[in-house]
Design a protein with these regions (language model features):
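Cell-envelope/extracellular polymer assembly enzymes that use nucleotide-activated donors
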Residues: 12-14, 45, 191
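Acidic helix N-cap motif at the loop->helix transition within catalytic regions
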Residues: 24-28, 55-64
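Conserved donor nucleotide-binding strand/loop of the catalytic core
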Residues: 44, 58-92
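A conserved acidic beta->alpha catalytic loop
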Residues: 50-59, 105
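Catalytic donor-sugar/metal-binding loop of nucleotide-sugar-dependent glycosyltransferases
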Residues: 184, 193-210
Length: 239
């Protein structure tokens, strides 16, 4: 955990957490993010994007809202996918800067201070995390690197970890890039960064600590992976 006294500050920040059946982690994650935001931002909001959870995720968040109105929930009636959750967060954020992290404990949100400091040093529009040491299987690492190589070949986008679920983004990026289309799987991350680069926004990277995910998301299912490759080629033809 970082020293809050030395942490970089920001005037206003919208943060959102995509969540699907996260009853085991969501309460702790929301509390940790809230504690950091109190010390980091003068004005802030914390949104949980509840993607059709069938467990107690919604109830846990609503109980937290009763204690702090900075916390909000956006409910999807059905499970629409990771891409849909990110879009709900992006397009609902009200402050000039937006951050998001996965809600299953993979990241330490107190590292947001490093993102803010990096943005101020570089005047970047997007600060993208990359894993210091990723706590996943070698197969996942290899497939991710193959994907990143393909994205670089097709679009010239070179980042260490396209799918890293910890980013700081200027709201003007969301307002100016072509509307995001992806719904399921992790293709949304590639689509977003490709469109941001194509529009001329500055992207910088910063290392983040990674902790093992509690469960496997839909982004790793074979049909979703295949569809992601199809979507990538479609995007290449359009751009």
């Amino acid at each position: 955990m970082l020293d809050f006294a030395c942490m970089a500050k920001i005037d206003s920040l919208s943060v959102f957490l995509p969540a699907f059946n996260e009853e085991k982690d969501i309460g702790r994650t929301v509390s940790q993010v809230r504690d950091t935001l109190i010390k980091t931002a003068d004005n802030w909001e914390l949104m949980v994007i509840n993607d059709g959870s069938k467990d107690n995720t919604r109830k846990i968040v609503e109980d937290l809202i009763n204690k702090d109105l900075h916390i909000k929930i956006i409910n999807h009636d059905i499970n629409r996918g990771y891409g849909a959750s990110l879009k709900s967060g992006f397009y609902s954020a009200k402050y000039p800067w937006i951050a998001f992290i996965d809600s299953d404990g993979q990241f330490d949100f107190s590292e947001i201070g490093k993102f803010i400091e990096k943005q101020k040093e570089t005047n970047a529009d997007l600060v993208v995390g990359y894993y210091i040491k990723r706590k996943v299987s070698y197969l996942k690492i290899i497939t991710s690197k193959v994907w990143e190589l393909l994205v670089f070949i097709l679009f010239g986008l070179k980042v260490r970890d396209i799918d890293c679920g910890f980013k700081l983004i200027s709201k003007k990026v969301i307002e100016k890039i072509p509307k995001l289309e992806s719904e399921r799987g992790a293709f949304i991350s590639s689509e977003f960064l490709i469109k941001a680069k194509k529009t001329g926004f500055k992207i910088v990277e910063i290392p983040v600590t990674h902790f093992p995910a509690r469960r496997v998301g839909t982004g790793r299912k074979l049909n979703v992976i295949i569809q992601s490759f199809v979507d990538l080629l479609k995007l290449w033809r359009r751009l």
